[in-house]
Amino acid sequence: MSLQPLLVFDFDGVILDGMDEYWSSSRKACLSLLRGVFLPEQTPSRFRQLRPWVHHGWEMVLIAAFLQESDGPLQRLGVDAFAADYDQQLRAGLDRFGWKPSLLQDSLERVRRQAVSGDRAGWVALHRPFKGVQERLAGLEEEGVAWSVLTTKGRDFTDELLDAFQLRPVRLDGRESGPKPEVLLRLRREWALKGFVEDRRATLEVVLETPGLEGLKCFLADWGYLRPADREGLPEGLDLLSTSKFAAPLAIWP
């Protein structure tokens, strides 16, 4: 095991805010699959509202497809009722459009590859680091703590963005590395894990229940893409990490 402690961070919604890129790429991927439909270039408010429910990138392409409908379930139910039955709505949407997650994920990544190769600067400009995050990550080294990234985003795209914003984690695990609890188990065998910072509560709850990850400190990033009730009734072992606590020395984190 490495003598150096390691703090693990999710990427989207924790380090970087890429909301406009999520929409831009999801919109283009959807339009490549549904010819002749209209989707606005500006990020719709309903897309922003549903983003906290998204686990994998392909879901955003399907949400774009829901948004182009004039009388679909999202229009009939409204965002709140749709989100309350989110997983079932995804399954029904895949059936209705005749799609598979792999098709949507491939379409999304193709759009992103084209954007990176054709206009990298424009693609990067659709992202921004959350306020204070770059400085705090740089400060971890002074505390003797390394940091890594664990994300469901493709590794290559994440690496492009880390490079663009001059962020240098000691390790990067993208969606290709497998489910987050499995990656954390591997990391725990190699490092002295200090904690995992994530903005998806459901992921953190799975981590807490994973055998072999007992005692791992889990932090819910208060500045991320949180659902309305995510901050309420947090289970033991899961702490809400505010921006002020995040900026403070690790020794006084919750």
Describe the residue ranges of each PLM region.
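Extreme N-terminal starter segment of soluble prokaryotic enzymes
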Residues: 2-8
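Short, charged, surface-exposed secondary-structure boundary motifs
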Residues: 177-185, 227-235, 250-253
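Short amphipathic alpha-helical segments and helix-helix/interface helices
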Residues: 134-141, 184-185, 204, 208, ...
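Acidic, Mg2+-coordinating phosphoryl-transfer loop and its flanking beta/alpha structural elements
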Residues: 26, 152, 195-242
